[in-house]
Amino acid sequence: MPKILVLYYSTYGHIETMAEAIAEGARSAGAEVDVKRVPETVPLDIAEKNHFKLDQKAPVATVAELEDYDAIIVGTGTRFGRMSSQMAAFLDGAGGLWARGALNGKVGAAFASTATQHGGQETTLFSIITNLLHFGMTIVGLPYAYQGQMGVDEVKGGAPYGATTIADGDGSRQPSATDLDGARFQGRHVAEITAKLVG
């Protein structure tokens, strides 16, 4: 059974919710799944003042443990059309793994959230995917086999590059049922592809 890490950074809980849905999907395909978050880099007083969600139950990941997994699914909210600085700092810290080729051949995937429909979902996914490709990972997206990302009948996330959600400028919109279904689909899809690759 493949061993999968869902690695995320979430300021207000939207990506935390998506991470749990991705993990649920991966487990439904028989994978062993851990959900972990990257360290917060914002000082506590500022995080509290800005109402960051500080009660997240997922343990904090370490760079060293990344090589223990067959697949890593990375998620973060967008910052100016790219991944958050917290996630970028964590991945930047994996230079030693890159130098040893420790992640070569592992499966990688991305998911994201933005405040608006045009707030950089796909560029944020690409910023994650670019890092994973530099690590030598094989990328798995959210294929159009997931029909929920089609149509314009409602505000919805999702792209062939990964599951997404839209939080609204004030963070009031939580991931919809469609967004969460997409996350579960991607988690299951990553688990199935990983199982084929690792035997």
UniProtKB/Swiss-Prot annotation:
| The keyword Manganese belongs to this UniProt entry's keyword annotation | no
Free-text cofactor note? Binds 1 FMN per monomer.
Official protein name in the record: NAD(P)H dehydrogenase (quinone)
Q: Which cofactor does it need?
A: FMN
Q: Does the keyword DNA damage apply?
A: no
Residues binding NAD(+) are 12
GO annotations of cellular component type: membrane
Q: Name one Pfam family in it.
A: FMN_red
Q: Cite the binding residues for FMN.
A: 10-15, 78-80, 113-119, 134
Catalytic activity line of the entry = a quinone + NADH + H(+) = a quinol + NAD(+); a quinone + NADPH + H(+) = a quinol + NADP(+)
UniProt xrefs under Gene3D superfamilies: 3.40.50.360
Task: Specify the Flavodoxin-like domain's residue ranges.
Answer: 4-190
Keywords associated with the record? Flavoprotein, FMN, NAD, NADP, Nucleotide-binding, Oxidoreductase
Q: Which domain of life is it from?
A: Bacteria
| Positions of disulphide bridges | none
User: Native species of this protein?
Assistant: Rhizorhabdus wittichii (strain DSM 6014 / CCUG 31198 / JCM 15750 / NBRC 105917 / EY 4224 / RW1)
Q: What is the lineage of its organism?
A: Bacteria, Pseudomonadati, Pseudomonadota, Alphaproteobacteria, Sphingomonadales
Q: Which GO terms describe its molecular function?
A: flavin adenine dinucleotide binding; FMN binding; NAD binding; NADH:ubiquinone reductase (non-electrogenic) activity; NADP binding; NADPH dehydrogenase (quinone) activity
PANTHER family for the chain: FLAVODOXIN-RELATED PROTEIN WRBA-RELATED, FLAVOPROTEIN-LIKE PROTEIN YCP4-RELATED
* HAMAP family noted in UniProt: NQOR (MF_01017)
Task: Give EC number(s), comma-separated.
Answer: 1.6.5.2
Q: Which family does it belong to?
A: Belongs to the WrbA family.
What are the binding positions for substrate in this chain?
A: 98
